[in-house]
UniProtKB/Swiss-Prot annotation:
Residues reported to bind nitrite: 65
Name of encoding gene: MB
Binding site for heme b: 94
PROSITE patterns for the chain: GLOBIN
Cellular compartment(s): Cytoplasm, Sarcoplasm
Organism name: Canis lupus familiaris (Dog)
Catalytic reactions of this protein: Fe(III)-heme b-[protein] + nitric oxide + H2O = Fe(II)-heme b-[protein] + nitrite + 2 H(+); H2O2 + AH2 = A + 2 H2O
A biological process from GO: removal of superoxide radicals
SUPFAM superfamilies the record matches: Globin-like
Highest taxon listed in the record's lineage: Eukaryota
Main location: cytoplasm
Residue numbers carrying Phosphothreonine: 68
Name of this chain's protein: Myoglobin
Amino acid sequence: MGLSDGEWQIVLNIWGKVETDLAGHGQEVLIRLFKNHPETLDKFDKFKHLKTEDEMKGSEDLKKHGNTVLTALGGILKKKGHHEAELKPLAQSHATKHKIPVKYLEFISDAIIQVLQSKHSGDFHADTEAAMKKALELFRNDIAAKYKELGFQG
């Protein structure tokens, strides 16, 4: 399940493009998540009042949270699978405080892929998509294992 050095390099290359505008990418990821899976919005008290895409686009709080999400994910990706220290507190908060099901992590992974395809179509080739999907799956599997350790059946 691990990624090769070459696959990690591909992931980090495309992630470098994301880092030029973490807040913008993050906001777009969350908007796609909420549009594609409106039930996920119930987990975000801060954003429940945002009913339209325009309201979401105008929300500085949504943009800030998108930045937070992608900053955390970038820190994990840069560890190239050696992300135990970064993952533990994230799993803890998402299992015990936020109660985010693993399924929702799949949904946001899909949204990330869609945003990368949309914003970086010239650089997001089949090998890039495959490597990123593999990295996100590794992240989700490791979060799911932590959830299990914590007794969260998300």
